[in-house]
From Swiss-Prot:
Lineage of the organism: Eukaryota, Metazoa, Chordata, Craniata, Vertebrata
Keywords for this protein: Cytoplasm, Endosome, Immunity, Innate immunity, Lysosome, Membrane, Nucleus, Phosphoprotein
Free-text comment about domains: The pLxIS motif constitutes an IRF5-binding motif: following phosphorylation, the phosphorylated pLxIS motif of TASL recruits IRF5.
Tissue distribution of the protein: Highly expressed in immune cell types such as B-cells, neutrophils, dendritic cells and monocytes, the expression levels are two-three-fold higher in female cells compared to male cells (at protein level). Expressed at low levels in T-cells and NK cells.
Disease per UniProt entry: Some alleles may be associated with systemic lupus erythematosus (SLE); a chronic, relapsing, inflammatory, and often febrile multisystemic disorder of connective tissue, characterized principally by involvement of the skin, joints, kidneys and serosal membranes. It is of unknown etiology, but is thought to represent a failure of the regulatory mechanisms of the autoimmune system. Because it evades X-chromosome inactivation, its expression is increased in female immune cells which may be involved to SLE striking sex imbalance towards females.
Keyword Cytoplasm: yes
Any one GO CC term of the record: nucleoplasm
Native source organism of the sequence: Homo sapiens (Human)
Effect listed in the UniProt record for changing S294A: Abolished ability to activate IRF5
Protein's recorded name: TLR adapter interacting with SLC15A4 on the lysosome
Amino acid sequence: MLSEGYLSGLEYWNDIHWSCASYNEQVAGEKEEETNSVATLSYSSVDETQVRSLYVSCKSSGKFISSVHSRESQHSRSQRVTVLQTNPNPVFESPNLAAVEICRDASRETYLVPSSCKSICKNYNDLQIAGGQVMAINSVTTDFPSESSFEYGPLLKSSEIPLPMEDSISTQPSDFPQKPIQRYSSYWRITSIKEKSSLQMQNPISNAVLNEYLEQKVVELYKQYIMDTVFHDSSPTQILASELIMTSVDQISLQVSREKNLETSKARDIVFSRLLQLMSTEITEISTPSLHISQYSNVNP
């Protein structure tokens, strides 16, 4: 539409240009005719009044034609302007589309749950999954046990899983003989992998059995961690072997040897013995050693 308006504007501009050019040519022609008529009047014997009347009539007829042409061009221009005003934004107009209502299917799929989940259907009666209503399974049309077998017990009690699901897993407990529990980490890691595989193959267990098993494993893990920390990782020899503590021991030994006028080796043995006493398990209370270190202790007043 914009290109059509631009082309129509070019056509209108060309009309005005040609009309003005024709009018100028007509005026120039009239001037030439006037000069020619004056020249001919001076040399002809035609009556002057007749020539002038003819000239006036021709001039008036030319002006009338030009005025009519200009009025027609103005009228066509006003029509184009009114068309553009009535349709100000024609590019972005589009036919009105009918609103399409998205209707839901009347026969929506109903998600059925076992009768053991009846508390969900009771407490959350408006629960929907993917647009489908959640309802209890009818025991007549399915192979699940009757509702009376799920009368008591929590919702997620694993011992109440229906029998057909239990029969699908068949293993012999004798395949995994129980071994005495030992108290070191390597055996704990190995047995945990074996027990994990055995738990996956055995029958479903209840929450109580599962919680007891997890508590037992956590206690074993903490005991093993404490034993490793006390007897291996945090032993006095390993603590004293660290670079930071040994540097501090050397500084303390030098200070003690200077203050007490002792050899460096003896002062170091004293510091080691004191640290071993502090880190021994027999002492439950740490006392501050009575060491008076001062550089002015041997100075006489």
